[in-house]
């Protein structure tokens, strides 16, 4: 008898232990991310070929205490390595675990490697060569809490690699995870007709077909670790292989189960067909290109098991919420009598099915924790799960009716106003209803949602549900497609995170404002490139700019500079610390047909630039951040603490009849008028003048002040 460890993803332990017991293994004991067991060599071959759940199987050749580098070396040296592999084979050490005297896994691997080659040398043999990437013989070592385990990799490359996958899609599902879904859902025991309406590359259906046809999942594999192990019995292994081939041939002829798969992506359907052909089960599975919302019921009753798209995989969250909600309707209306199992990492998405789960489990898709929910759909029932939707809600149009009505009202009122003003981007909703605590901005034909932090007294589950309701209700209320809606989450600003880049993918559009055009990026950054609350302030800058030298400090994307230039400024100097925003400002100038020759764009630490500046300006606009401690700045910046010092310097750069417009977004900002007056400035608050209609609900969104030289 040999002692083994079968490794598997976290959460597989229970299923794997049952599988090993059914194979006939003894001393089966669950551990973290795997199961220990004992078996004969022949049974070990059979388990390695037939396991649908294990990722790797190793045969344990040493287990004992280890408290020092010397003990580690001696434990490895005492193993009779020449009896395990030939010195003509390349080898490698996979070491896992740290602690105590082992600071890193490389140290542990090196110690064992030294012991192995020394043992060969002392036995009179030439040393074997190390091959880290693709060694013929692999040693597996684990160190934990002073205990060392050394094993031989019996199975070879990861067992989830069955050998039938041509390539993967954007979000592949590992084969042993698909198999565990089939086991834990109860399908493997029942083996009835199976449908996957989000089939992707076909993994769930192919694994199910292999089960139904009694085909060993390892039959297509080209390589096993034990083939380089000197205790390998080729005759015994060939017997196990022949038995598996015979079972597969018989199983294909006896299989009565029907399999149906569909996907909206034709590329994935083609890939699924190729994979099924490679696995030898293509004649059993009917694949089609189809939107899951249009999928037909293939038979009276059956199982649906699927891994639908979710945030970490594919798609816009608003589109996905709509998809899940509508798919839940589809299930209730058309699939009465069916059993359904869904894998999803996003609790809010799977909750949007609005179905009551019979059972909820956790599984890991790689490092991603997922919910695996089982449902029984009752025939002729369209009733939704009452606790999730308000009483009487049966249609998506009835979700958050007060919110939807407010949106429609605001669109009607603000839409007319915006058209009259000559703008096509504005704040549509600003936490008008306290329970729906979001800001919604309309940018041309697109919508951006930002969620405000909820009070600590409101449970997280409630805030998540309300946000889901907003995302579900908004497309219907606005009459737009969900892909026109973007959700952004705002966190407390910390240093350089003020304008943190969010994604490589860009959604760029052009907006118009009082005759000016601006480029927006709705997805690349937390902010879009245009602060809508400063719209009137920018207009004021343009109105005051004619014939004047203008300075725009902390310029962001230069929108105020554009208004100044269009307003007839003699010259505009645009200063910002970010190269990205200076380039963006130039693009905005070019978009408006403004010749850059008379205007200056400066990438610099704004505070240092002011200290070094010797020019004078007739109009200065400054809208600094509330706080910043960027690595590129000499000092940190706090608008409350530092505004007097900065404004005092800027007053000196102001021509005798010049004007300075100072704005910031600090909620409880207190302007030190007394100190500025002492520096020779006249200070007037112009908040009301600069507050647009779409921000009247939030009058403290910013502070705006007009400074001139004292009389």
UniProtKB/Swiss-Prot annotation:
Work out whether the entry's keyword set contains Lyase.
no
Record GO terms (molecular function): 23S rRNA (guanine(2445)-N(2))-methyltransferase activity; RNA binding; rRNA (guanine-N7-)-methyltransferase activity
SUPFAM superfamilies, A to Z: S-adenosyl-L-methionine-dependent methyltransferases
Q: Name one GO cellular component term.
A: cytoplasm
Tell me the protein's name.
Answer: Ribosomal RNA large subunit methyltransferase K/L
Q: Is Lyase included in the keywords of this UniProt record? A: no
Superkingdom in the source lineage = Bacteria
Q: Which NCBIfam families match?
A: PRK11783.1 (NF008748)
Give every THUMP domain span: 43-154
Where does this protein reside within or beyond the cell? Cytoplasm
- The UniProt record lists the EC number as 2.1.1.173, 2.1.1.264
The chemistry this enzyme catalyses reads:
guanosine(2445) in 23S rRNA + S-adenosyl-L-methionine = N(2)-methylguanosine(2445) in 23S rRNA + S-adenosyl-L-homocysteine + H(+); guanosine(2069) in 23S rRNA + S-adenosyl-L-methionine = N(2)-methylguanosine(2069) in 23S rRNA + S-adenosyl-L-homocysteine + H(+)
Tell me which HAMAP family the record gives: 23SrRNA_methyltr_KL
């Amino acid at each position: 008898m040999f002692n083994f460890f079968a490794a598997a993803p976290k959460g597989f332990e229970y299923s794997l232990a049952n599988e090993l017991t059914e194979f006939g293994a003894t001393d089966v004991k669950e551990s973290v991310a795997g199961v220990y067991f004992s078996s004969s060599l022949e049974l070990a071959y059979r388990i390695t070929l037939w396991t649908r759940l294990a990722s790797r199987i190793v045969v344990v050749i040493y287990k004992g205490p280890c408290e020092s580098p010397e003990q580690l070396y001696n434990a490895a040296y005492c193993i009779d390595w020449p009896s395990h592999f030939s010195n003509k084979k390349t080898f490698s050490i996979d070491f896992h675990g740290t602690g105590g005297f082992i600071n890193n896994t490389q140290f542990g691997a090196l110690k064992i490697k030294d012991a192995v080659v020394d043992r060969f040398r002392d036995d009179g043999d030439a040393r074997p060569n190390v091959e880290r990437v693709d060694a013929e013989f692999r040693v597996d070592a684990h160190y934990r809490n002073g205990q060392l385990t050394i094993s031989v990799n019996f199975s070879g490359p990861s067992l989830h690699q069955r050998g039938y996958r041509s390539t993967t899609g954007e979000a592949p599902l590992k084969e042993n995870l698909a198999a565990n879904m089939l086991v834990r859902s109860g399908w493997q025991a029942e083996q009835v007709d199976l449908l996957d309406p989000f089939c992707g590359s076909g993994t769930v259906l192919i694994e199910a077909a292999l089960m139904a046809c009694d085909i060993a999942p390892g039959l297509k594999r080209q390589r096993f670790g034990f083939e380089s192990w000197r205790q390998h019995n080729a005759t015994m292994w060939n017997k196990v292989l022949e038995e598996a081939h015979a079972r597969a041939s018989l199983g294909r002829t006896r299989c009565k189960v029907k399999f149906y798969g569909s996907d909206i992506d034709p590329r994935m359907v083609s890939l699924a067909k190729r994979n099924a052909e490679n696995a030898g089960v293509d004649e059993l599975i009917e694949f089609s290109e189809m939107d899951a919302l249009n999928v037909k019921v293939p038979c009276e009753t059956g199982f649906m098991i699927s891994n639908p798209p979710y945030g970490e995989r594919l798609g816009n969250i608003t589109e996905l919420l709509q998809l899940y909600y509508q798919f839940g309707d589809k299930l209730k209306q058309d699939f009465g009598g069916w059993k359904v199992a869904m894998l999803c990492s996003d609790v809010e998405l799977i909750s949007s099915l609005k179905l009551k789960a019979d059972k909820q489990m956790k599984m890991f898709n790689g490092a991603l924790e997922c919910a695996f929910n089982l449902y029984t759909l009752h025939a002729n029932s369209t009733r939704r799960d009452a606790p999730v939707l308000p009483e009487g809600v049966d249609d998506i149009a009835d979700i958050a009716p007060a919110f939807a009505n407010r949106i429609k009202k605001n669109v009607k009122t603000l839409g007319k106003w915006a058209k009259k003003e000559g703008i096509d981007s504005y704040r549509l909703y600003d936490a008008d209803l306290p329970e729906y605590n979001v800001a919604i901005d309309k940018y041309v034909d697109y919508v951006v949602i930002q969620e405000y932090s909820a009070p600590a007294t409101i449970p997280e589950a409630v805030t998540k549900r309300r946000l889901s309701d907003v995302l579900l209700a908004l497309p219907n209320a606005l009459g737009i497609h969900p892909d026109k809606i973007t959700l952004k989450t705002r966190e407390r600003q910390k240093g350089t995170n003020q304008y943190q880049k969010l994604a490589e993918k860009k959604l760029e559009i052009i907006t118009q404002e009082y005759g000016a055009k601006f480029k927006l990026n709705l997805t690349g950054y937390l902010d879009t490139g245009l602060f809508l609350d400063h719209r009137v302030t920018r207009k004021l800058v343009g109105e005051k700019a004619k014939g004047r030298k203008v300075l725009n400090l902390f310029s962001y994307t230069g929108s105020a500079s554009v208004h100044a230039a269009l307003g007839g400024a003699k010259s505009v100097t645009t200063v910002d610390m970010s190269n990205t925003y200076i380039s963006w400002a130039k693009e905005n100038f070019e978009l408006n047909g403004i010749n850059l020759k008379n205007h200056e764009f400066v990438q610099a630490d704004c505070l240092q630039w002011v200290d070094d500046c010797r020019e004078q300006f007739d109009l200065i606009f400054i809208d600094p951040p509330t706080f910043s401690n960027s690595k590129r700045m000499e000092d940190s910046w706090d608008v409350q603490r530092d505004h007097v010092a900065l404004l005092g310097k800027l007053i000196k750069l102001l021509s005798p009849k010049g004007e300075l417009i100072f704005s910031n977004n600090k909620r409880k900002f207190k302007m030190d008028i007394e100190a500025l007056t002492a520096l020779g400035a006249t200070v007037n608050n112009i908040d009301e003048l600069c507050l647009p209609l779409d921000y009247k609900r939030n009058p403290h969104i910013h502070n705006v002040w007009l400074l001139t030289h004292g009389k």
